[in-house]
Amino acid sequence: MVNVPKTRRTFCKKCGKHQPHKVTQYKKGKDSLYAQGRRRYDRKRSGYGGQTKPIFRKKAKTTKKIVLRLECVEPNCRSKRMLAIKRCKHFELGGDKKRKGQVIQF
């Protein structure tokens, strides 16, 4: 389980100094219907004849690499950058911190 705080003080390239950054998890945007590859694929698929490209079925990985999106909280900066961290099965953003000697409650 990887637990990352929602804010982090780190270097901002635009400000040129360490600033607090808001941390969110990167998510892939929706694929465009008008990208060249998609247009070519749709054209090829139209009409008679079935699936024209192989459907990938040999998945190798069980996890994805976590990518953090850091946004500077300075009002007139707001620059964003990505930061990749290692693979993990469970990722948590801003969860409770572990305390030493605490009793585990269910």
Curated annotation (Swiss-Prot):
GO terms for cellular component: cytoplasm; ribonucleoprotein complex; ribosome. GO terms for biological process: translation. GO terms for molecular function: structural constituent of ribosome. SUPFAM superfamilies: Zn-binding ribosomal proteins. It is found in: Cytoplasm. InterPro entries: Ribosomal_eL44 (IPR000552), Ribosomal_LSU_eL42 (IPR053708), Ribosomal_zn-bd (IPR011332). Its main location: cytoplasm. Keywords: Cytoplasm, Methylation, Ribonucleoprotein, Ribosomal protein. The modification N6-methyllysine is found at residue 53. It comes from the Eukaryota. Residues 34-53 are annotated as: Disordered. The keyword Cytoplasm applies. Belongs to the eukaryotic ribosomal protein eL42 family. This is Large ribosomal subunit protein eL42. It comes from Pongo abelii (Sumatran orangutan). The lineage of its organism: Eukaryota, Metazoa, Chordata, Craniata, Vertebrata. The gene is RPL36AL.
